[in-house]
Amino acid sequence: MPDILDKIMAVKRQEIAAAQKKSPLEAVRFDAESRVLTRDFEGALRTRIAAGHAAVIAEVKKASPSKGVLREDFIPADIAQSYAEGDGEISAACLSVLTDKQFFQGGVDYLKQARASCDLPVLRKDFIVDAYQVYESRAMGADAVLLIAACLDDAQMKDYEAIARGLGMAVLVEVHDAAELERALKLKTPLIGVNNRNLRNFEVSIQATIDLLPRLPADRLAVTESGIATREDVATLRAAGVHAFLVGEAFMRAKEPGEALAALFK
């Protein structure tokens, strides 16, 4: 099985080199530091949980390497509004927007459009391998960034977290196994995403989250990611003590993503 993650990271480095020729780091950093205040990503999650509800980070995702195109009529602003409204009772706490172009058919403009259409905090979902992308994330309007432990060494994670927090962004650090979790716990961020999908072979099991939960200190907030498709999945994870969920694929195939979200978390 070819290592998908290595391929993605190689492409990311090429993209960054090209981007820096168009917009040097100094310019992107200036744009990032000039942005107005961020929306409170962590606060939005904790508010839902404190009220006894599941905190849902709803994903705006056109395609994936494993499933191909998920949604042909892909209008990020409409999708974001649908998530924000839900069914009037249950709705998204935050958004996650894919900005990777080559593998997920995402884009920076999609994040801007989604954020402009609602009041929800927005996570930039991409494969960050360079500080340039952290500044770029804030410059495009992201309120939070994803740092994937499998893509970064300890020094990079610490450095990129410091940059993100200095810009007012929340950091969701993503892990898949116990070794990655131990590394993630060295960071300051309380937001720990457990990806139920192994990024090296794209196999999925929600057991990944259940296995790691007991290792999480009480001051950290677990966010389960990937493979959450049924109400049974949600019930199993909630029974295990999970309160925050990042879900995309299950909603992207629905006519009204917000209604699909509400139905899954009833």
From Swiss-Prot:
Xref: NCBIfam families: PRK00278.1-6, PRK00278.2-4
Family: Belongs to the TrpC family.
Record field: catalytic activity: 1-(2-carboxyphenylamino)-1-deoxy-D-ribulose 5-phosphate + H(+) = (1S,2R)-1-C-(indol-3-yl)glycerol 3-phosphate + CO2 + H2O
Organism lineage string: Bacteria, Pseudomonadati, Pseudomonadota, Betaproteobacteria, Burkholderiales
GO annotation terms (biological process): L-tryptophan biosynthetic process
Family matches, as SUPFAM superfamilies: Ribulose-phoshate binding barrel (SSF51366)
Domain of life: Bacteria
InterPro entries, sorted: Aldolase_TIM (IPR013785), Indole-3-glycerol_P_synth (IPR045186), Indole-3-glycerol_P_synth_dom (IPR013798), Indole-3-GlycerolPSynthase_CS (IPR001468), RibuloseP-bd_barrel (IPR011060)
Top-level EC class: lyase
Gene Ontology MF term list: indole-3-glycerol-phosphate synthase activity; phosphoribosylanthranilate isomerase activity
Name of the protein described by the UniProt record: Indole-3-glycerol phosphate synthase
Entry's EC annotation: 4.1.1.48
Pfam family, one: IGPS
Pathway annotation: Amino-acid biosynthesis; L-tryptophan biosynthesis; L-tryptophan from chorismate: step 4/5
Keywords: Amino-acid biosynthesis, Aromatic amino acid biosynthesis, Decarboxylase, Lyase, Tryptophan biosynthesis
